[in-house]
Amino acid sequence: MLWLVTMGRRLNGVFIAFMIVAFMIGVAGALQAPTLSLFLSREVGAQPFWVGLFYTVNAIAGILVSLGLAKRSDQQGDRKKLIMFCCLMAVGNALLFAFNRHYLTLITCGVMLASLASTAMPQLFALAREYADSSAREVVMFSSIMRAQISVAWVVGPPMAFMLALNYGFTAMYAIAAGIFVISLVLVALWLPSVKRIEQPADIAVTEVSGWGKIGRAHV
C-alpha cells in the first residue's frame, strides 16, 4: 500500500499518459501478431512457404526501417512527431489488412507500413526516458511500469484477437486495431510532451512491440 502511495506521488499526468499509450499500442499490436499466420492461410489462401516468406521479409524490413528511423531520430527531429507518424502508418497498415486479400500487396505495402509502425514503441520508450530525465523522475521505476503495461497488453490482446477473428472476422479485428491506433495517435498529440534532445552517454536497449511482435533497439 505504501508503495502505491509513493508511486502515485511520483507519477504525474504525463507519465500516466505514457502508460496509457504504451498499453493501447501494445494491445493493438497484440491483436494483429498472433493471428497473422491464420489470416494469411485462411483469408489470403497462402501456402506454408509463402506464409514463412512473409515473416522473413517482414522481419528483415522491420529491422532495417527501425534502425534507420532510430538513427535519424537520435540525430534530429522530434520523437513525438515520429511516434504520431508511426501510429498513422499503423492505422494504414491495419486498414490495409482489413480490406485487402492480395498477397503481393500485403508483402510489399503491408510490410512497409508495418515496419514503419513498429518503430512507435521504442520511440515511445525513448521519449519517456528523455522526459523522465528532464523532469528529474526515477527513470528505472517508470520504465518498469511502462514495460508492465506491455505485458498486460499481451495477456489481454491474443485471446481478444482470436475471439474477434473467429466470431466476427478478420475485417472487424483489424478495424478495431486501427481504431485503437487512432485513439493512441490522438492521445500522443494531446498529452505527450516534446522534449528537447539531450546527449546521452550510452545506448539504451528498448523492447519493441510492433504489429508483429518484433524486438528492436532505440538509441537514446
What spans do the regions from the language model cover?
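Helix-loop junctions at membrane interfaces in 12-TM secondary transporters
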Residues: 13, 98-110
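Residue-level signature of mid-helix packing/kink "hotspots" within the transmembrane helices
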Residues: 59-67, 154-155
